[in-house]
């Protein structure tokens, strides 16, 4: 029954529509907020270190590339879609009304405007994200430099390959991808809109394509072929980077077959492109189709079959002769790329052919008196136990080596900064307030002379002897001896360092600054401190506090009373990370080390400029080339721009202040074109080499990673003759570490910093050294060293041993020492109660004609949490003889080298150790007694005092198997001899 009322129309579901848009909007905002917060806090950080120009330049470049690539991709996509839609047939007269094509077309026409907007936007955004990653390539192109060196095939300057070719490749690859996308849009679009009809032979339906579709597809294909022509042209230059079994670079086949083939294919591509463009007039796809088939056949025949046949029938039977010229190119280019040219490397051929007498070896005081006994890879726990002071202080797993001058003599030191270790905080120390506002910094630097221990460790179970002599270990070093060393620490507090930045939870920050002069930071047991440095970002305002609260997901940054108007936050405190942030174009060395410069503890970081390739230059993996047993022990890693490199220079020395975190970059290689290019990108960020102070220069080391890469290259590229290079019979190899633990037996032996005789002058020199063994042989083949002294920094010397003599290599020397009856017996006796550690096996050229192997042996009591390593014995191998004793002097005597004839053993004064073990008896000055190590460290006299020490040591050794009373008397006699020695030496 009619009621007279009509049902009201349903109201539009606006809330549901709004919800549909609101959810994606919230998701986008949720994704953007963390990014915006990170960008804002990074912007603040770069302002703190005065490198905001770097941040702005990188962001501006990336945004510009994002917009540029996005617009280009969006325009190409839009045009492809618009031309496709515009060229659709008016009527689908040959299609069944129920055909899916008809339905597709209806759907496309209904949403064509949305389609022509959404698809270009999506592809444009994707292209923008990909394109902005190439910011370094683009910036280097616009700031490109000449190398002054040209390749031997095309005569192009290396700058073309380093800066221009990558940019051209970027352009060509971009247009190639976009044209493929445009072709696919046209192909699929014309099919969906009816411009292309698929045939069906069973139904008697022929396929068809409209003239408009033919023209659009043909023009797109023709444009792609033009881009392909450019790619063929650039491929010619890329041939010079091809990798082969024997060498890298263009081979005989590449130059004489592949290179001409690229030119032929380029011409064919041009002809085929013309055939594609002819469709505009002919409206016939048969000609381009036939041309494409011919091009594919030609590509297979000319680009593949011809080179294969030349390689098989011409090159393979005569490879040594055919490849000789190209191997020579590879040798020359690789030496340039890795800085191992003849002007940088001095080869001493047939070194040691005449040998050296024991007397000459003993008189090699520059080496013998500086034999390193402290292994920085082993004694970190010793530093920790003796110099930690509090549980929250710590040292790196791998300590560092540096050098200082003592009484006019150069000595090497094991050095470490006493940093705050956030992972060592316990219980209430981990409370947010304590961790981030109280325990904020470390305190002091520790240095121990590397060739000394406090006294002789005669017994494995004794608590005396075998420990470092800490020349510098207090919180604020101002004593006379430290001043003589040049170690005067005016500001010992350490807010920045690798250990302090090693928090496992990633919360690497400290909140400093206080109101009303109320200090809360722990400094010493009796004092607190308030940070006064310029480092850190101010978080006194609400915006910054909120930003960092979101960054670290920590509400306490907003709610805590410890955060006030004067508060600053210190973060990103790893020195290598800070250098990498301000110089993202630098690869940083895997190690950093502390030095006292101008009264402050500074972290020195080596920076490398790299290229992925240069013509004919061998490429290598940085991570593989630098991997050795020390790399696996330490807690550091490289900050890599790229792992695979074909060019490297140690072009920058970076210094990070441990107190305020400031970063200074110094130009070190003034001839590096890559550095010059980056200085053009970021002007004013790198200081001139002339601004490096003398004090800083005296602490710069030749970097380990650079040395290891050069070591890997020199193992092969010391060979001059191309035929010898081809046969490999003159190659060397880096020995595996014979002192490594069981799981690292095949890992390369590290390079070691030592003070030893300069290869030319014979004077003490701070060097980085490594041995080479023959290829697949254990005999020593060569010895490589490089100086870190300012006068001849970077001078590489390779001592090449004669091939007609056999000199034990590191593994053979190790096996010889370990097979000694006394050593084997002692190890068997001790291993049940002690952990034994073989220290660094040093391969030392001595007497300008012989090799001396020295290895310290450390012991540590088992199952004792408080135990730590001590030097127990010294092993020596010389001319096949083995020395094994508690002191280096005794060990040398056992192999026929009289330590009394080493001049520095009689003249150098040992340093007074600071109080380092409260359980040790003290002398009148309140310091623990020190046993010199000429004996144990290389100090002493040539007179009666040293003779009495040796006599006492012999008696002590004899009394070892006697009664306790005899042993005690011998020990007393040794103490008297040592005291007499100290008086004579003036200690």
From Swiss-Prot:
Residues 904-927 have a biased composition (Basic and acidic residues). Signal peptide: none annotated. The keyword Transmembrane applies. The chain crosses the membrane at residues 19-39, 63-83, 115-135, 176-196, 212-234, 261-281, 290-310. Residues 928-943 have a biased composition (Low complexity). Pfam families: UPF0182. InterPro entries: UPF0182. GO terms for cellular component: extracellular region; plasma membrane. It is a multi-pass membrane protein. Residues 904-950 are annotated as: Disordered. The keyword Membrane applies. It is found in: Cell membrane. Belongs to the UPF0182 family. This is UPF0182 protein DIP0733. The lineage of its organism: Bacteria, Bacillati, Actinomycetota, Actinomycetes, Mycobacteriales.
């Amino acid at each position: 029954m009619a009621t007279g009322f009509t049902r009201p129309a349903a109201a539009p579901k606006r809330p549901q529509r709004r919800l549909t848009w609101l959810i994606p909007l919230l998701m986008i905002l949720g994704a953007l907020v963390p990014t915006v917060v990170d960008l804002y806090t990074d912007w603040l950080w770069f302002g703190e270190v005065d490198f905001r120009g770097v941040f702005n330049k990188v962001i501006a470049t990336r945004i510009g590339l994002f917009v540029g690539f996005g617009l280009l991709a969006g325009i190409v996509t839009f045009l492809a879609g618009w031309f496709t839609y515009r060229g659709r047939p008016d009527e689908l007269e040959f299609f069944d009304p129920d055909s899916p094509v008809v339905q597709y077309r209806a759907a496309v026409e209904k949403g064509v405007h949305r389609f022509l907007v959404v698809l270009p936007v999506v592809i444009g955004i994707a292209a923008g994200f990909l394109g902005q990653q190439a910011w370094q390539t683009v910036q280097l192109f616009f700031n490109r430099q000449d190398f002054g060196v040209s390749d031997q095939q095309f005569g192009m300057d290396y700058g073309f390959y380093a800066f221009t070719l990558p940019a051209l490749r970027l352009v060509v690859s971009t247009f190639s991808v976009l044209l493929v996308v445009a072709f696919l849009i046209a192909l699929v679009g014309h099919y969906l809109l009816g411009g292309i009809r698929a045939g069906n032979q069973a139904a008697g339906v022929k396929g068809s394509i409209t003239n408009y579709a033919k023209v659009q597809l043909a023009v797109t294909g023709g444009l792609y072929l033009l881009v392909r022509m450019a790619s063929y042209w650039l491929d010619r230059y890329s041939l010079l980077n091809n990798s082969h079994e024997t060498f890298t670079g263009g081979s005989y086949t590449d130059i004489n077959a592949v290179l001409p083939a690229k030119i032929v294919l380029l011409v064919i591509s041009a002809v085929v492109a013309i055939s594609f463009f002819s469709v505009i007039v002919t409206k016939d796809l048969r000609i381009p189709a036939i041309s494409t088939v011919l091009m594919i056949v030609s590509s297979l025949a000319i680009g593949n079959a011809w080179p294969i046949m030349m390689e098989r029938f011409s090159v393979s039977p005569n490879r040594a002769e055919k490849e000789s010229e190209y191997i020579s190119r590879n040798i020359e280019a690789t030496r340039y790329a890795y800085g191992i040219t003849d002007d940088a490397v001095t080869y001493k051929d047939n070194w040691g052919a005449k040998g050296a007498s024991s007397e000459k070896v003993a008189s090699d005081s520059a080496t013998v008196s500086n034999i390193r006994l402290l292994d920085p890879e082993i004694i970190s726990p010793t530093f920790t136990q003796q110099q930690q002071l509090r549980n929250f202080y710590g040292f790196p797993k791998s300590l560092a080596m540096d050098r200082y001058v003592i009484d006019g003599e150069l000595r090497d030191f094991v050095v470490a900064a006493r940093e705050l270790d956030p992972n060592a905080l316990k219980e209430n120390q981990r409370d947010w307030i304590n961790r981030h506002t109280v325990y904020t910094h470390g305190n002091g630097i520790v240095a121990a002379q590397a060739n000394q221990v406090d006294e002789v460790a005669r017994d494995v179970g004794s608590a005396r002897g075998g420990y470092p002599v800490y020349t510098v270990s207090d919180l604020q070093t101002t004593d006379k001896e430290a001043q003589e060393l040049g170690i005067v620490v005016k500001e010992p507090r350490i807010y920045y360092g690798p250990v302090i930045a090693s928090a496992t939870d990633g919360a690497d920050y400290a909140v400093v600054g206080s109101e009303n002069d109320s200090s809360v930071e722990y400094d010493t047991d009796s004092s607190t401190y308030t940070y006064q440095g310029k480092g850190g970002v101010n978080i006194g305002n609400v915006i910054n506090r909120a930003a960092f609260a979101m960054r670290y997901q920590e509400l306490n940054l907003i709610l805590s009373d410890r955060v006030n108007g004067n508060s600053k936050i210190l973060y990103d405190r790893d020195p290598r990370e800070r250098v990498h942030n301000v110089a993202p174009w630098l690869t940083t060395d895997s190690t950093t080390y502390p030095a006292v410069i101008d009264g402050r503890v500074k972290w020195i970081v080596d920076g490398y400029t790299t290229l992925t390739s240069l013509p004919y230059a061998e490429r290598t993996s940085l991570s593989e080339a630098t991997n050795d047993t020390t790399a696996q022990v330490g807690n550091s890693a490289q900050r890599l721009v790229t792992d695979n490199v074909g060019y490297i220079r140690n072009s920058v020395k970076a210094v990070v202040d441990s107190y305020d975190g400031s970063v200074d970059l110094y130009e070190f290689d003034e001839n590096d074109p890559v550095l010059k290019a980056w200085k053009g990108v970021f002007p004013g960020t790198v200081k001139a080499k002339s601004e490096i102070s003398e004090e800083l220069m005296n602490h710069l080391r030749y970097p380990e990673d650079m040395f290891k890469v050069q070591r890997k290259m020199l193992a092969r590229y010391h060979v001059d003759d191309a035929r010898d290079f081809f046969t490999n019979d003159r190659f060397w190899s880096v020995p595996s570490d014979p002192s490594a633990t069981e799981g690292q037996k095949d890992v390369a032996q590290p390079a070691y910093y030592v003070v030893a005789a300069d290869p030319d002058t014979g004077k003490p020199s701070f060097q980085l050294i490594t041995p080479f063994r023959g290829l697949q042989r254990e005999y020593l083949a060569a010895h490589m060293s490089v100086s870190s002294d300012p006068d001849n920094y970077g001078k590489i010397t390779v001592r090449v041993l004669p091939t007609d003599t056999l000199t034990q290599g590191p593994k053979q020397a190790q096996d010889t020492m370990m097979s000694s009856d006394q050593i084997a017996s002692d190890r068997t006796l001790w291993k049940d109660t002690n952990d034994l550690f073989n220290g660094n096996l040093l391969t030392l050229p001595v007497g300008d004609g012989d090799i001396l192997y020295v290895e310290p042996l450390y012991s540590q009591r088992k199952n004792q949490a408080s135990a730590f390593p001590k030097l127990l014995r010294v092993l020596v191998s010389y001319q096949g003889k083995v020395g094994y004793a508690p002191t280096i002097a005794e060990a040398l005597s056992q192999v026929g080298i009289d330590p009394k004839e080493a001049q520095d053993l009689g003249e150098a004064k040992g340093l007074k150790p600071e109080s380092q073990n409260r359980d040790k008896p003290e002398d009148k000055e309140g310091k623990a007694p020190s046993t010199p190590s000429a004996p144990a460290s290389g100090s002493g006299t040539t007179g009666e005092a040293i003779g009495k020490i040796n006599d006492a040591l012999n008696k002590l050794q004899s009394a070892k198997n006697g009664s306790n009373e005899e042993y005690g008397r011998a020990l007393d006699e040794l103490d008297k001899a040592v005291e007499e020695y100290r008086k004579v030496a003036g200690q």
